[in-house]
């Protein structure tokens, strides 16, 4: 909405600057850009945006300051139409704290989505409708059923994947991915009916399948173990009994190379004789 901020030169400059700064600064610059575009629409849109971002960043920096990449990647995943990848992958590689930046990123996306789809109404200059637009904006952003359902389902799915993948069972990561995928689809279906939200089941199923594929790729690089060679052992000390399950990592057998040395001195002496 603000042409000066949307110029390629500004975008390139911010990209270069953020590449040298911590990921949390990238999230801060993203919030400032969002506020600038909101200011270009109207004063009340700017006020609501600043209020939402202030509360959101206060919660984020208090609870999960080290998960800035989640806050940055969440709106990007929504724009790429692959948001269902996030709860599955974060459940494997992160923990419950990732639900906070995931929810904050979801709020940012829906805020931008609403501003884009209601540009004409929000940019109206009629002063008598300013209070009406303000209430309408707050009502549609904070009480958006699709947004609330998405935050709730993603948080529950992330927790399911996280809890299962930490269990001491064989192939726990694969079980966690399958359970998370099923719960994601089922929760969106049930939640859409209960909350009367507009949910496209086909899009949810397709997005979940893409999430399963990405999660399997992450599992391949993050956890390569051979469950067929699992070993169990137990021992004790003065205070505790210990029961240990050892799962070896996958390894590629390297064939031993035999180097045969030929003594050239012996050959030369034989020739002289």
Where are these regions (language model features)?
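Hydrophobic transmembrane alpha-helices
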Residues: 1-31, 37-38, 47
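Hydrophobic alpha-helical membrane segments of integral membrane proteins
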Residues: 27-29, 46-51, 66-74, 86-90
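Membrane-helix interface "capping/anchor" motifs
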Residues: 17-28, 40-41, 58-69, 92-100, ...
């Amino acid at each position: 909405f603000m042409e000066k901020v949307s110029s390629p030169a500004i975008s390139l400059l911010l990209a270069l600057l953020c590449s040298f700064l911590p990921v949390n600064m990238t999230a801060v610059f993203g919030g400032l850009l969002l506020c600038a575009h909101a200011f270009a629409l109207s004063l009340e849109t700017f006020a609501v945006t600043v209020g939402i971002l202030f509360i959101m960043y206060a919660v984020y920096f208090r609870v999960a300051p080290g998960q800035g990449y989640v806050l940055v990647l969440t709106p990007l995943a929504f724009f790429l139409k692959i948001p269902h990848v996030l709860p599955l992958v974060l459940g494997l590689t992160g923990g419950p704290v990732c639900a906070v930046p995931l929810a904050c990123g979801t709020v940012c996306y829906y805020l931008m989505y609403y501003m884009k789809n209601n540009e004409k109404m929000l940019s109206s200059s009629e002063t008598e409708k300013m209070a009406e637009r303000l209430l309408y904006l707050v009502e549609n952003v904070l009480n958006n059923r699709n947004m609330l359902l998405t935050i709730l389902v993603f948080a529950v799915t992330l927790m399911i994947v996280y809890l299962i993948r930490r269990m001491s069972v064989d192939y726990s990561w694969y079980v966690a991915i399958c359970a998370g995928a099923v719960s994601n689809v089922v929760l969106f279906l049930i939640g859409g009916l209960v909350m009367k939200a507009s949910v496209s089941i086909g899009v949810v199923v397709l997005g979940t399948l893409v999430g399963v594929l990405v999660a399997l790729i992450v599992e391949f690089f993050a956890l390569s173990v051979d469950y067929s060679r699992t070993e169990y052992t137990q021992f004790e000390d003065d205070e505790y009994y210990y029961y240990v399950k050892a799962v070896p990592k996958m390894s590629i057998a390297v064939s031993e190379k035999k180097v045969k040395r030929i003594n050239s001195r012996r050959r030369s002496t034989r020739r002289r004789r």
